[in-house]
Amino acid sequence: MYQDLIRNELNEAAETLANFLKDDANIHAIQRAALLLADSFKAGGKVLSCGNGGSHCDAMHFAEELTGRYRENRPGYPAIAISDVSHISCVGNDFGFNDIFSRYVEAVGREGDVLLGISTSGNSANVIKAIAAAREKGMKVITLTGKDGGKMAGTADIEIRVPHFGYADRIQEIHIKVIHILIQLIEKEMVK
């Protein structure tokens, strides 16, 4: 009944991944991002992550795998997803939704820390404001974006962009693969 649809969805996902994989710049950006994160951890820094909707879930998943575990039994790494409901509702009410991430970065971000901002469109105003706040704090910035990078294009130290112009779910599928690879590389780098 839905077998053709299922095959089409899986083929499109595989094609999106294959296109991403063809660009060596993506491979280099992932490696650079992992090394930047590991260097921050080794120097006593932390990573803050943020995004909206599915990207918010990815930001939480990234932090959870770092503080908990991914594949290896090892110490937890300092990672915080900006996901505290009381913070988000307070700042959203008192300042506005566009400030929910930047206020948190202002409060706990420090020089030597890293911000991971995730947006499939690259146009999330609250993530863009978080990037600006991170810059003011002297933090490094890594972004996971899609399409043409949107307004976030060129704002990060390292941008990992999925140049897919269809639905956001294909971009999110690559983002979660990138997140898992980042964690795997961080685990390898931290035991050196």
From Swiss-Prot:
Pfam name, any one: SIS_2
Quaternary structure and partners: Homotetramer.
Pathway listed: Carbohydrate biosynthesis; D-glycero-D-manno-heptose 7-phosphate biosynthesis; D-glycero-alpha-D-manno-heptose 7-phosphate and D-glycero-beta-D-manno-heptose 7-phosphate from sedoheptulose 7-phosphate: step 1/1
MF GO annotations: carbohydrate derivative binding; D-sedoheptulose 7-phosphate isomerase activity; zinc ion binding
Keyword annotations: Carbohydrate metabolism, Cytoplasm, Isomerase, Metal-binding, Zinc
Protein name: Phosphoheptose isomerase
Domain of life: Bacteria
PROSITE patterns: SIS (PS51464)
All residue ranges annotated as the SIS domain in the record: 37-192
Signal peptide: none
Keyword Nucleotide-binding listed: no
Localisation per UniProt entry: Cytoplasm
Residues noted as binding substrate in the record, renumbered to the chain: N52, G53, G54, E65, N93, D94, S119, T120, S121, S124, Q172
Note: The reaction produces a racemic mixture of D-glycero-alpha-D-manno-heptose 7-phosphate and D-glycero-beta-D-manno-heptose 7-phosphate.
Cofactor names: Zn(2+)
Binding residues annotated for Zn(2+), in chain numbering: H61, E65, Q172, H180
Biological role stated in the UniProt entry: Catalyzes the isomerization of sedoheptulose 7-phosphate in D-glycero-D-manno-heptose 7-phosphate.
Annotated family: Belongs to the SIS family. GmhA subfamily.
Broad EC category: isomerase
Main subcellular location: cytoplasm
GO cellular component terms, semicolon-separated: cytoplasm
InterPro entries reported in the protein's UniProt record: GmhA/DiaA, Phosphoheptose_Isoase, SIS_dom, SIS_dom_sf, SIS_GmhA/DiaA_subfam
NCBIfam families with a match to the protein in the record: gmhA, PRK00414.1
Any Gene Ontology biological process: carbohydrate metabolic process
